[in-house]
């Protein structure tokens, strides 16, 4: 069984749905990327263009995002494709209005890696934007509904970035919908990082039970009513677990 590293997203998945973790990370049956995730990638491309080029018009940044979206969804069968595409211009605009006052980022998509004592594999990730000159980093999230505070899985993710970029870093998350935006400062970084570490330790203990992927099928049982098993994932789950 091949396993080389953790990521905040995989560890959050391990917490949220052990069986989906088995399907994707142990069995290698990755689910098709849906329109929401593709939209997030495209919006980030447009926003990065606008941040790195302060004189670029909003329209040109939107064009970058739409071209990216059209490219990565060209073969997508997601019926929501056009609906999500239509929200990209407003999301790019919202995010740039929020983040351009920070200036030009010193880093984009900066790789971070952490391997604390007791872990066999490192936890790695890529932070979206860092302004070294301000001691600030921001992770950008696209969403349908604006949250009133930082979501816990996102807090764990950004705590990793913050801890790997300096003791006094001001870590923030910016959420954007087509009509609203908000930026929240991450607090309790050490506590969230500790939680991520503990989840990783339990994940490795789970993986250490066997080198045989079939073992994890025999010892787990998916809840197919969970939203994790919507769409094609449910049929794949039926085939893998046999019920």
What are these regions (language model features)?
Residues 25, 140-142, 173-175:
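Residue-level recognition of conserved beta-strand positions in structured domain cores
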Residues 1-126, 233, 238-243:
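Metal-dependent nuclease catalytic cores that hydrolyze phosphodiester bonds in DNA/RNA
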Residues 36, 147-154, 186-189, 193:
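Flexible, glycine- and charge-enriched loops at secondary-structure boundaries
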Residues 165-243:
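Metal-dependent nuclease catalytic regions and adjoining charged, substrate-binding loops involved
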Residues 29, 144-146, 179-180:
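Short, surface-exposed beta-strand-loop junctions and turns on beta-sheet-rich folds
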Residues 100-104, 132-136, 165-169:
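Short glycine/proline-enriched coil/turn segments at helix->beta-strand junctions
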């Amino acid at each position: 069984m091949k396993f080389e590293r953790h990521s905040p997203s995989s560890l959050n998945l391990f917490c949220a749905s052990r069986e989906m973790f088995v399907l994707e990370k142990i069995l290698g049956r990755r689910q098709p990327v849906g329109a929401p995730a593709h939209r997030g990638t495209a919006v980030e491309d447009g926003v990065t263009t606008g941040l790195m080029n302060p004189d670029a018009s909003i329209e040109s940044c939107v064009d970058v995002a739409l071209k990216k979206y059209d490219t990565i969804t060209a073969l997508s069968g997601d019926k929501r494709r056009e609906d999500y595409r239509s929200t990209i211009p407003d999301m790019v605009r919202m995010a740039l209005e929020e983040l351009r006052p920070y200036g030009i980022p010193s880093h984009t998509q900066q790789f971070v890696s952490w391997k604390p004592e007791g872990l066999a594999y490192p936890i790695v990730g890529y932070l979206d934007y860092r302004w070294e000159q301000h001691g600030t980093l921001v992770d950008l999230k696209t969403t349908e509904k604006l949250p009133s505070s930082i979501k816990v899985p996102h807090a764990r993710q950004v705590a990793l970035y913050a801890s790997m970029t300096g003791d006094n870093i001001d870590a923030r998350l910016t959420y954007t919908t087509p009509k609203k935006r908000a930026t929240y400062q991450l607090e309790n970084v050490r506590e969230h990082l500790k939680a991520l570490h503990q989840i990783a330790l339990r994940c490795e203990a789970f993986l250490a039970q066997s080198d045989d992927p079939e073992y994890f099928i025999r010892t787990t049982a998916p809840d197919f009513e969970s939203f994790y098993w919507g769409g094609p994932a449910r049929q794949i789950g039926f085939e893998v677990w046999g019920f």
